[in-house]
C-alpha cells in the first residue's frame, strides 16, 4: 500500500540493514546497472504493447513479441499457445506484458538466512519467477528442502521497480498481489516464542503478478547487519 501511494515512475528498494559507508562507488554502479536494465526493458515492452493495440498486427510481429516474452522476460506461455487464433494470442500477450516490472539484483548464495529466486507454480498451474522466503517453504518436504539447499543465489533485496504503464499511467499495484501467499512464521519476543501469520510480503506475494527479471550483482553490494557482530565486518568500518 505504501508503494502504491507513490507517484514516482521508478522506485529503488533496498533493505535498511544492508547499508554500508564503504564500496559506495560499486554500489552506485550496480544500482545504475539494474536501473538501466529496467529502463531498457520498459522501452521494449511499451513499444510492443503499442504494436499489439494496432489493428494490423502481423503474424511476424506476434512471433517476435512472443519470443521476447519467453527469452528476455522468461514468461512461461501455455503449451498450446500456437493453436489459438491471433486474437487470443494478442490479448494474452497484452495482458502478460501490461504489468508493473521489477528488476531484482541477486547475489551468490553464501549461506545467509533469507529468500532467493525460484521458479514457482501457483494453484492454477502457472509457472513464474518469484522471490521466495525460506519461511514460505515446507522444509520437511525432502524435495523442497533439496531445492533450497541447491539454490545458487540469494535475495539481498536490491530491487528497482517500474510503477507506470505504457501510457504513463500509474498501475494500481493492489491488482497484482497474490492474496494466497500469506504464511505462518515463528517469532520470539522477550524470550517468548510464538507463531504469527504474515500477509503477502512486499517482494514476494505483493509482487507475485509483476514482470520479474533477476540479475546477478556482486557480493560487494550486499553488506547486511543481522547481528551486532556484523558491524565488525570491513564493510561497516570507517
Predicted features, each with a name:
Residues 1, 90, 143-145, 197-201:
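Short alpha-helical segments and helix-capping/turn motifs at coil-helix boundaries
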Residues 17, 21-22, 32-70, 148-238:
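Conserved catalytic alpha/beta cores of large enzymes that bind or transform nucleotide phosphates
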Residues 141-142, 164:
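Long insertion/accessory domains within large nucleic-acid-processing enzymes
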Residues 9-11, 99-103, 114-118, 128-130, ...:
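Structural beta-strand/beta-sheet cores of well-ordered domains, especially the beta-sheet scaffolds
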Residues 1-110, 119, 124-130, 135-136, ...:
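Domain-scale recognition of functional cores that engage charged ligands
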Amino acid at each position: 500500500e505504501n508503494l502504491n501511494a507513490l507517484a514516482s515512475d521508478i522506485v529503488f528498494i533496498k533493505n535498511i540493514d544492508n547499508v554500508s559507508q564503504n564500496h559506495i562507488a560499486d554500489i552506485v554502479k550496480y544500482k545504475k546497472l539494474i536501473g538501466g536494465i529496467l529502463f531498457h526493458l520498459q522501452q521494449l515492452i511499451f513499444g510492443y504493447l503499442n504494436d499489439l493495440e494496432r489493428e494490423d498486427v502481423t503474424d511476424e510481429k506476434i512471433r517476435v513479441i512472443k519470443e521476447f516474452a519467453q527469452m528476455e522476460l522468461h514468461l512461461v506461455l501455455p503449451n498450446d499457445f500456437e493453436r489459438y487464433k491471433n486474437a487470443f494470442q494478442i490479448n494474452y500477450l497484452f495482458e502478460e506484458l501490461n504489468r508493473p516490472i521489477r528488476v531484482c539484483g541477486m547475489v551468490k548464495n553464501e549461506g545467509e538466512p533469507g529468500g532467493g529466486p525460484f521458479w514457482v507454480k501457483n494453484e492454477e498451474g502457472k509457472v513464474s519467477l518469484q522471490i521466495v522466503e525460506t519461511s514460505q517453504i515446507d522444509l520437511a518436504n525432502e524435495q523442497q528442502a533439496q531445492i533450497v539447499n541447491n539454490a545458487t543465489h540469494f535475495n539481498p533485496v536490491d530491487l528497482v521497480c517500474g510503477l507506470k504503464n505504457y501510457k504513463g499511467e500509474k498501475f494500481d499495484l493492489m491488482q497484482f498481489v497474490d492474496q494466497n501467499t500469506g504464511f505462518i512464521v515463528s517469532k520470539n519476543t522477550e524470550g517468548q516464542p510464538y507463531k504469527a501469520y504474515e500477509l503477502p510480503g512486499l517482494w514476494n506475494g505483493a509482487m507475485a503478478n509483476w514482470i520479474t527479471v533477476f540479475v546477478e550483482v556482486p557480493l560487494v553490494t550486499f553488506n547486511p547487519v543481522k547481528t551486532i557482530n556484523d558491524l565488525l565486518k570491513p564493510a561497516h568500518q570507517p
